Amino acid sequence: MSAKSRTIGIIGAPFSKGQPRGGVEEGPTVLRKAGLLEKLKEQECDVKDYGDLPFADIPNDSPFQIVKNPRSVGKASEQLAGKVAEVKKNGRISLVLGGDHSLAIGSISGHARVHPDLGVIWVDAHTDINTPLTTTSGNLHGQPVSFLLKELKGKIPDVPGFSWVTPCISAKDIVYIGLRDVDPGEHYILKTLGIKYFSMTEVDRLGIGKVMEETLSYLLGRKKRPIHLSFDVDGLDPSFTPATGTPVVGGLTYREGLYITEEIYKTGLLSGLDIMEVNPSLGKTPEEVTRTVNTAVAITLACFGLAREGNHKPIDYLNPPK
């Protein structure tokens, strides 16, 4: 694989206001403390750390209808979009360490500024495609995709803090994997727009090999293009990632998570990656936190070439005789 698929720019995004539970802003810290950067370097990656974004507190951030913390969420994603665009212009794969999944508005927007033809693979128990009008919780981490989709332009009210957002992907540019907790309004949007998805039912029926074959053929079949993988750790079963805000039983296994990421790496087209919703405050025990963090690290390493079959550099003296 080319050196390009191992050239990474890391952005920490310690932000939690897209959802109600404290602790997810510690995600970047615990992923770094687990040795993520060192491990990436050990597997021959060229890693540049852009540090953690400084998110200022926005006072008087009153709700918009029932949408909570709109200005804080909008501003955080605006900052992240600028930083991701910078990383992409520097020729690196952007690796965003979240933080809650509302940040994908910024991550994908920034990526699309440099690569407008990107395709998105969204691994999650949830579709995160509620609009500010269909949401029942008001939490923006359940709404990022609705802000990004061109087909929903005109269906999204003018939420304070979001005037900078321009929808940048079409319904045909995204594939979901791992769905198992989808609101009725979200299901209506999926079906109406004809969005490609593999719920856990499809994963069970087809197997993860077929799911990835179909996903990559759907996104890359007509033309090779950059891939943005937005990975919510709650896409995996809570037995592997318990320390997260909205766990749902019956998720992807550790092995299925690794298979998804190994296959994406093998395309050589991974261009942006989000690792979202690791919340160390929500582990019932220290071991649950460690398990969640270690799983998130393993998923990340597989995105950049770590293979379960093993890896090696050229070993000249073992070359077969001519």
Curated annotation (Swiss-Prot):
Record's cofactor remark: Binds 2 manganese ions per subunit.
EC number, UniProt record: 3.5.3.1
Sites of N6-succinyllysine modification: 17, 75
Amino acids binding Mn(2+) 1: 101, 124, 128, 232
Catalytic activity from the UniProt record: L-arginine + H2O = urea + L-ornithine
NCBIfam families on file: rocF_arginase
Protein name (database record): Arginase-1
Species, as recorded: Homo sapiens
